[in-house]
Amino acid sequence: MSTVELNTSAGRIVLELNDAEAPKTVENFLAYVRSGHYDGTIFHRVISDFMIQGGGFTPDMQQKSTLAPIQNEADNGLRNDNYTVAMARTNDPHSATAQFFINVKDNAFLNHTSKTPNGWGYAVFGRVTEGQDVVDAIKGVKTGSSRGHQDVPVQPVVIESAKILG
């Protein structure tokens, strides 16, 4: 299992990544970490009873360029439970690139149920092993609208650095 540390303006979060169950997703995430993609990005979507999403925007809400989308691995048996990390995507099940989210409660409706557009779900590829208190603090920040986006923290929550620990 790979481990990644996110140093954020709200504190430190450590993610344990499940290479065995989500190999393509983990390799994709690690490629973004290695390239420095996440450094200086924000948690741009925060919904207190759902999830916190980041990895795609700068503090001034400029979207970062990404690599090609990856195949959805949501059929790996991992569940969108509290403190798990999963890939964000559009309505296309196979559109995930760099953005990810941390579930802040059990979100069973995001789990894979079938290989159909509505059943694919969202690929879980890891979990928070340290910094659950930081995740809880982030989910409680005040949010508003910014540049056409909803649920954006009024005070940016910045991922100052992301690094591979092991």
From Swiss-Prot:
GO terms (BP aspect): DNA catabolic process; protein folding
Means of activity regulation: Inhibition by cyclosporin A with a Ki of 21 mu-mol.
Subcellular location(s) of the protein: Cytoplasm
Annotated PPIase cyclophilin-type domain residues: 2-164
Keywords on record: Cytoplasm, Isomerase, Rotamase
Catalysed reactions, semicolon-separated: [protein]-peptidylproline (omega=180) = [protein]-peptidylproline (omega=0)
EC supergroup of this enzyme: isomerase
InterPro entries: Cyclophilin-like_dom_sf (IPR029000), Cyclophilin-type_PPIase (IPR024936), Cyclophilin-type_PPIase_CS (IPR020892), Cyclophilin-type_PPIase_dom (IPR002130), E_coli_cyclophilin_A-like (IPR044665)
pH relationship of activity: Optimum pH is 8-8.5.
A Pfam family the protein falls into: Pro_isomerase
Predominant localisation class: cytoplasm
Record GO terms (molecular function): endonuclease activity; magnesium ion binding; peptidyl-prolyl cis-trans isomerase activity
Entry's EC annotation: 5.2.1.8
Highest rank taxon of the organism: Bacteria
GO CC annotations, alphabetized: cytoplasm; extracellular region
Role this protein plays: PPIases accelerate the folding of proteins. It catalyzes the cis-trans isomerization of proline imidic peptide bonds in oligopeptides.
Family: Belongs to the cyclophilin-type PPIase family.
Subunit-level organization: Monomer.
Record's protein name: Peptidyl-prolyl cis-trans isomerase cyp18
Gene source species: Streptomyces antibioticus
Lineage of origin: Bacteria, Bacillati, Actinomycetota, Actinomycetes, Kitasatosporales
